[in-house]
Structure formats: structure tokens, C-alpha cells
Amino acid sequence: DRTGLEREIPGLGPEWSTGLLFEQDGQIDNRRQLMRALERACVSLGVRFMEGAEVLDLERESAGELCGIHLRSAEGEQQQLRCQQAVLCSGAWSQQLVPQLPVFPVKGQMLSLQGPREALKRVIFGPGTYLVPREDGLIVVGATSERDAGFAEGLTPDGQKQLQAGIASLLPTAATWPPMERWWGFRPCTPDEGPLLGPGPLPGLWLACGHHRNGVLLAAITAELTAGGVMKKAPNAAEEALLGAFRWNRFEN
């Protein structure tokens, strides 16, 4: 009820009278902390990063199997890397390498505000807008969902107005807090908004794409299923069911 809402979220907009409380709901700073931690962990295990490189094409044997990738380095040099297996995790751009994959971009705009420390202790999900608090008082505000924008870059007045309206509705006091950043990105979406996992249309190619808004949430199980496939580990019944449910060609009649 309203009393409970005010206890959990002081300053909540007056139009809200009921809500659902998820005690175990949380958040992580994926842009700054999570990705840096993952990079350090990968480097410690011997993973080599080629920053700024672009994969131009997948190399195939005469029988159609994957045999390598053709890429361009950050310095503009083209080269081939030989491999028998590869994982496609190119997000919204996955279809550029494998045209038959049903992955398309959904643009999202976001912004952040600097509020007082601990001004908001709960993540708030409203219709079309959410507020995510960080430890230092930073509030991340998201996000638009623009299915017709394609890969159009940049912020838009309509998108920013939507976010500002959401702030005013959910936490009116935050509307006066100074903005810190504004940015946009492209979610990798599929027709049913579920990911594409498991073997791809090219023998030797494994898929880990199309996660839409749930990339971080599904990262662990995606990694487990993908690593198992690459290592030729036989899936158990539960894993086999997941791989079947999220196969890339499930939309075909």
C-alpha cells in the first residue's frame, strides 16, 4: 500500500498507491565495474583481447565448415585467424556476419543523475522507466525502447523527454538533480525477445546473441552452455532443453 511504498521509497511520486517489493532484487555497475572485472579475470587466464578489431567475414572450408575468421585490426591491417570453432557474440550486429540470424537492433537511450548519497536505496521499475541507484548517489535512468530506429545513432528530444517524464512521475525530487551523462545503445533483439544459443547455421560456429535486455542476467548460463558446446561436453537434460528452446532456427515454419 501507499504507507509501505513511502517506507521503502521516500519521495515516491504521489500517483503510485501500490507496488511489488522484491527483497532479493539488486543491481551491478556493468558499464564500469563488471566489464573491468571480467577483463582482468580473462587476462589472468591467458585470454588475448584485440581491441578495436572488426571481424569482416567467416572463412569456410569447401564443405561449409568454419575454418577461420577474416578481420581488420585497429590499425587497419587485414588478417586471417585460423580456427575450427568460434563463438558469435556480436550483439545487435550479429546478422552482419550471419545474415540468416533473426537478430535486429532495438535502440535505447539512458541518462544518469547525481543525487545525495543513499537518496534511493531500491531499484524502481515503473511503466517505461526505471531508476537504478549506485552507492555514491548516482541514479541511472532508463530506458527508451525504439524498435523502428534501426542503427540510428544519437540522442533524440523525444527519447530524453520520455526519460524526464518518467523521473518526474517516479521520484519527483530527482527531477532537480544535476544530469551527469546521457548515452544510447542498441539491444540485440529477436522476434520472441529470447536469445540465440547453441550451434549456428555454420558447422563450428556457436551462438551467444540476441539477449535483448537480459544480457547480464543470462550471462552465466549462456557462458556455461556455450563453453560446454565448444568443449564438446554432452549436455544434460536441462541444458538440452534450453538449447532446444533457444535454437537459432526456431522461428522457421
Residue ranges and their predicted role:
Residues 56-81, 86:
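Conserved beta-strand-loop-beta-strand element in the redox core of flavoprotein oxidoreductases
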Residues 1-6, 103, 123, 233-241:
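A short alpha-helix-loop-beta-strand transition element characteristic
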Residues 76-125, 153-157, 173, 237:
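Central helical "cap/lid" subdomain
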Residues 117-204:
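Active-site lid/adjacent beta-loop-alpha segment flanking the redox-cofactor pocket in flavoenzymes
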Residues 1-45, 50-51, 57-65, 189:
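Flavin (FAD/FMN) cofactor-binding and adjacent substrate-gating region
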Residues 60, 97-99, 150-152, 217-218:
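Short glycine-/acidic-enriched loop or helix-start segments at secondary-structure transitions
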Residues 31, 173-253:
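C-terminal catalytic lobe of FAD-dependent flavoproteins
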Residues 25, 32-44, 52-55, 69-75, ...:
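Flavin (primarily FAD) cofactor-binding/catalytic cores of flavoenzymes
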